[in-house]
Amino acid sequence: MVKRHIGSWILVLFVVMWSDVGLCKKRPKPGGGWNTGGSRYPGQGSPGGNRYPSQGGGGWGQPHGGGWGQPHGGGWGQPHGGGWGQPHGGGWGQPHGGGGWGQGGTHSQWNKPSKPKTNMKHMAGAAAAGAVVGGLGGYMLGSAMSRPLIHFGNDYEDRYYRENMHRYPNQVYYRPVDQYSNQNNFVHDCVNITVKEHTVTTTTKGENFTETDIKMMERVVEQMCITQYQRESQAYYQRGASVILFSSPPVILLISLLIFLIVG
């Protein structure tokens, strides 16, 4: 009789446990995903232009209340009258007339960074995929990916991309997904840091990038950052589901009961 009651209680606990797990799986995921509302990325069809400005202020691509990519009356991607993707007259990615990436000086050239950095491939060899990269403020280096096949709308750019795609990154830098409110923010940050690091390390070796290279590199890195987000987000929710499963009261009670039966 006692064994029959124990078996009944175990059956009830299993039903409660799996009901709790089912409810956990049906809970909506937080944050806005890709094309699920909130801020969205701009269209892909515009030639040239830096689609990932690093300045704060207005909405996406609208710092200080300017039009799309036109803060303070600049041209397309030309805030304060700078050149292509040159806010405040600096080089590409040089806000306020800065020198190299992240440089505050006014005399350094974009293609002459003052502090050489380790090449991305060397970092990849030194650190396992997903490990924190030293000197990058908590960014991790993703695993290598195949560069996506992208069509740019004309034969010249399509051919140029096929011939030069080996010069563009095949890994991305990123922070953990739980540090971002949605996919757009993750991808924006991922693109900026990856293009920046790849550009600096490549120009240090004496190879420069044209405007066409930068445009294509952003498109390539964007697709890889989206893939990286999807991978990391899936892993994050799987870890969360495991924690919820093994920390739920029915599971704890069931484990305690099994231990009691085994020991007793």
From Swiss-Prot:
PROSITE patterns: PRION_1, PRION_2
UniProt membrane topology term: Lipid-anchor; GPI-anchor
Residues that, per the record, bind Cu(2+) 2: H80, G81, G82
Gly residues: bias regions: 55-105
GO function terms (MF aspect): copper ion binding
Coiled coil: none
Summary of subunit composition and partner proteins: Monomer and homodimer. Has a tendency to aggregate into amyloid fibrils containing a cross-beta spine, formed by a steric zipper of superposed beta-strands. Soluble oligomers may represent an intermediate stage on the path to fibril formation. Copper binding may promote oligomerization. Interacts with GRB2, APP, ERI3/PRNPIP and SYN1. Mislocalized cytosolically exposed PrP interacts with MGRN1; this interaction alters MGRN1 subcellular location and causes lysosomal enlargement. Interacts with KIAA1191.
Entry similarity comment: Belongs to the prion family.
UniProt disease annotation: Variations in PRNP are responsible of transmissible bovine spongiform encephalopathies (BSE), a class of neurodegenerative diseases that affect various mammals. These diseases are caused by abnormally folded prion proteins. BSE can be subdivided into at least three groups: classical, H-type and L-type, with the latter 2 collectively referred to as atypical BSE. Susceptibility or resistance to a BSE disease can be influenced by at least 3 factors related to the host prion protein: protein expression levels, number of octapeptide repeats, and specific polymorphisms.
Domain comment quoted from the record: The normal, monomeric form has a mainly alpha-helical structure. The disease-associated, protease-resistant form forms amyloid fibrils containing a cross-beta spine, formed by a steric zipper of superposed beta-strands. Disease mutations may favor intermolecular contacts via short beta strands, and may thereby trigger oligomerization. Contains an N-terminal region composed of octamer repeats. At low copper concentrations, the sidechains of His residues from three or four repeats contribute to the binding of a single copper ion. Alternatively, a copper ion can be bound by interaction with the sidechain and backbone amide nitrogen of a single His residue. The observed copper binding stoichiometry suggests that two repeat regions cooperate to stabilize the binding of a single copper ion. At higher copper concentrations, each octamer can bind one copper ion by interactions with the His sidechain and Gly backbone atoms.
Name by which UniProt lists this protein: Major prion protein
Gene: PRNP
